[in-house]
Design a protein with these regions (language model features):
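Helix-loop boundary and gating motifs at the non-cytosolic
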Residues: 1-54, 214-265
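Juxtamembrane intracellular "pre-TM" segments in multi-pass secondary transporters
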Residues: 1-8, 189-227, 410-416
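Hydrophobic alpha-helical transmembrane segments
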Residues: 98-109, 133-195, 259, 263, ...
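Substrate-agnostic recognition of the 12-TM MFS/MFS-like secondary transporter fold
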Residues: 9-25, 49-64, 68-80, 100-160, ...
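Residue-level recognition of membrane-helix boundary sites in multi-pass small-molecule transporters
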Residues: 9, 25, 40-41, 71, ...
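C-terminal transmembrane bundle of multi-pass solute transporters/carriers
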Residues: 55-59, 66, 70-72, 86, ...
Length: 416
């Protein structure tokens, strides 16, 4: 095994997982929308998955530090395969009522939270072993995420059209199992607790959670990022879970076009992510972050709200995708370089949980906007909200600290 084997294995495992996740992101909303005809119920299902995901991602941070992120990730991926497979299995037996669906997707979300956090927490160690910078590894991870999302979105459109939305979820279940095997084989010996730093016997679980918060709240740039990304994630969740599927259904574009649209977004963002991986270290972080967010956000919503032709929707999506590819490499480097190794699991999990904290409301908000205003006004409102949010870094001074190297920090003592 070479020093780059863990990096390659982690990227492959994550890519496979993202393919399955993208399939479920399209298949589940389409399944609910097709069987119930309700945008509100579609939003509720999205909220039922995201809410426990956020909660368990936040609460699982100390577990990652105590047990090790690799072990947590492997267990969560293995169990997730069977939970996701339960949806089409129960549907085939005629046992998948709406309340049962809510419970199953909630369990899936609860497992995905710490599982995803574990993958992220292994990033700095994998980068160190491979001899790569955080910007480069974050850029490669973003490129894999975007390209896998592109393939998964296209695959989702084909699967839903051919075998149905419920049966398409078997692909997501299989992706968890394959990811489990690849990650387990390629990262042997990595992802263990930091010895001598995190003493599980000396502090309680609650104190370790408090340590994570005590550190995070003293980093103004991380708090600013969390607040902004929480709002943009809220709007994006409304888009992917409700607004885009309803637009595709009401415009007559259909699920195939919806899948292609997501695939184009993912594919074009790969270009941006690869550029960021290659030259990200030389780009000014703050300026790149602001410009990329302005381009990838509001225009997507406005072009759909104006009932533009499909070629215009796809053209804007391509440009937005390229811009979005620059975001995760910047965010990943800024966040990870500021967190001490002994606190990495709990702080990174809490950071991500805050960024995702409003997402459970995204689907519900999207459903309410469509029900109250109609799809075009709902898209326009979402686009304006996105524009206002992406202008925030120009008015909040702490964002400019992105371009500064972090000072050496000592672990924050536990509070009582």
């Amino acid at each position: 095994m070479t020093r780059r084997t863990p990096l390659v294995g982690a990227l492959v495992a994550e890519g496979i997982s993202f393919v399955g996740t993208r399939v479920s992101m399209i298949a589940i909303p389409w399944f609910v929308l097709s069987t119930t005809g309700s945008a509100t119920q579609t939003g509720l299902v999205a909220a039922a998955e995201i809410a426990p995901l956020v909660v368990f991602k936040a609460l699982g941070g100390p577990l990652l530090d105590r047990v090790g992120p690799r072990r947590v990730t492997l267990v969560c991926d293995f169990l997730s395969a069977f939970v996701v497979a339960a949806i089409p299995f129960l549907h085939g037996l005629g046992l998948l009522s709406f309340p049962v669906l809510l419970v199953v997707v909630a369990v899936a979300g609860a497992l995905r939270g710490p599982g995803d956090a574990g993958k992220s927490a292994m990033g700095p160690e994998i980068a160190r072993v491979a001899g790569f910078s955080l910007e480069r590894v974050s850029g490669l991870a973003a490129a894999v995420e975007r390209s896998s999302s592109m393939g998964g979105a296209a695959l989702a459109g084909l699967l839903v059209a051919s075998v149905g939305a419920a049966n398409a979820l078997y692909v997501d279940a299989a992706s968890f199992l394959v990811s489990f095997v690849v990650l387990g084989v390629s990262t042997t010996g990595l992802g263990r607790p930091v010895p001598g730093e995190v003493d599980a016997d000396a502090t309680s679980y609650a104190q370790e959670l408090r340590q994570g918060w005590d550190f995070l709240r003293t980093e103004p740039v991380l708090i600013a990022i969390c607040a902004m990304v929480a709002v943009t994630n809220l709007i994006d969740q409304a888009y992917s879970a409700v607004l885009a599927p309803v637009w595709a259904k009401e415009s007559g574009a259909g699920v195939a076009v919806l899948g292609t649209l997501f695939a184009v977004m993912g594919g074009s963002s790969v270009v941006g992510a690869l550029v960021a991986a290659k030259w990200g270290e030389t780009l000014p972080r703050f300026r790149t972050y602001v410009i990329a967010f302005l381009i990838c956000g509001a225009p997507r919503y406005v072009v759909m709200a104006l009932d533009s032709p499909l070629w215009a929707v796809f053209a804007i999506t391509v440009v937005a995708g390229v811009a979005s590819g620059f975001l995760n490499p910047i965010l990943g480097a800024v966040i990870m370089e500021r967190i001490p190794a002994p606190l990495l699991g709990r702080v990174s999990s809490l950071n991500t949980a805050i960024c995702w904290s409003l997402m459970p409301l995204g689907g519900v908000l999207g459903g309410l906007l469509v029900a109250g205003l109609g799809i075009s006004p709902a898209l326009l409102v979402a686009g304006v909200a996105y524009l206002v949010t992406t202008m925030a870094p120009t008015r909040v001074p702490s964002f400019r600290r992105m371009d500064r190297a972090p000072a050496t920090r000592e672990p924050v003592p536990s509070g009582v």
